[in-house]
Swiss-Prot record:
Pathway assigned in UniProt: Glycolipid biosynthesis; lipid IV(A) biosynthesis; lipid IV(A) from (3R)-3-hydroxytetradecanoyl-[acyl-carrier-protein] and UDP-N-acetyl-alpha-D-glucosamine: step 1/6
The name this protein goes by in its record: Acyl-[acyl-carrier-protein]--UDP-N-acetylglucosamine O-acyltransferase
Subcellular location: Cytoplasm
Pfam families assigned to the protein according to its UniProt record, in alphabetical order: Acetyltransf_11 (PF13720), Hexapep (PF00132)
Gene source species: Salmonella arizonae (strain ATCC BAA-731 / CDC346-86 / RSK2980)
Length: 262
């Protein structure tokens, strides 16, 4: 179904079965597949390809040569009906690629809302990107990566499959991330190592001074105390009982499968 207010350029191809909401704009030479749903106010600039079982929310801007919902690069993939879901108000810049999921990984690649994916960023199969994240130019997420809210991934940075990047993390450019990055941490290098707490980012997002001090204390327990990882986790859990901001660390430890960067 195509809303009567949607615009489709004469050179674009929108296949039968696609759903376009109100005021959707499909620019020149775009291709929209038959199982695609695009929400109200979303704009495809030009030469954008949206394929597969892909659902895109409202008021997104998708720039030229982006490819969304295409077959993933997992050699085990055999054409199963897997999906891509994208939220609202994202800016997806030129040549970004977002691949559909795999059955083995849950069948869904998901991008939240209010994100900026810069030129040539790649989101592989079964990744989850939260809200208000930034993937800078040429940032690359391997399969099954999870990026939590407000994280920033620097340009030319590659993230290993199954890694978790915690909320409010900043990963510097040209880095290689092979383990999980705890929330609030600045990481840099190949392999990425911790360089402190993202204090400026936390201030900009309204964290209190007391909360930031508690986060820094948790960071010190994890990285500066000389304690074993298990002992540091126990003390951080005690700290989290008094400071809710620190609970993000304990939740991260429960999810982590590759272990925190060291």
């Amino acid at each position: 179904m195509i809303d009567k207010s949607a615009f489709i350029h004469p050179t674009a191809i929108v296949e039968d079965g696609a759903v376009l909401g109100a005021n959707v704009h499909i620019g020149p030479f775009c291709i929209v597949g038959p199982q695609v749903e695009i929400g109200e106010g979303t704009v495809l600039k030009s030469h954008v390809v949206v394929n597969g079982q892909t659902k895109i929310g409202r008021d997104n801007e998708i720039y030229q040569f982006a490819s969304i919902g295409e077959v993933n690069q997992d050699l085990k993939y055999a054409g199963e009906p897997t999906r891509v879901e994208i939220g609202d108000r994202n800016r997806i810049r030129e040549s970004v690629t977002i691949h559909r999921g795999t059955v083995q990984g849950g069948g869904l690649t998901k991008v939240g809302s209010d994100n900026l994916l810069m030129i040539n960023a790649h989101v592989a199969h079964d990744c989850t990107v939260g809200n208000r994240c930034i993937l800078a130019n040429n940032a690359t997420l391997a399969g099954h990566v999870s990026i939590d809210d407000f994280a920033i991934i620097g340009g030319m940075t590659a993230v290993h499959q199954f890694c978790i990047i915690g909320a409010h993390v900043m990963v510097g450019g040209c880095s290689g991330v092979a383990q999980d990055v705890p929330p609030y941490v600045i990481a840099q290098g190949n392999h990425a190592t911790p360089f402190g707490v993202n204090i400026e980012g936390l201030k900009r997002r309204g964290f209190s001074r007391e909360g930031i001090v508690a986060i820094r204390n948790a960071y010190k327990l994890l990285y500066r105390s000389g304690k074993t990882l298990d002992d540091a986790k126990l003390e951080i859990a005690e700290l989290a009982e008094k400071h809710p901001e620190v609970k993000a660390f304990t939740e991260f430890f429960e999810r982590s499968t590759r272990g925190p960067i060291r």
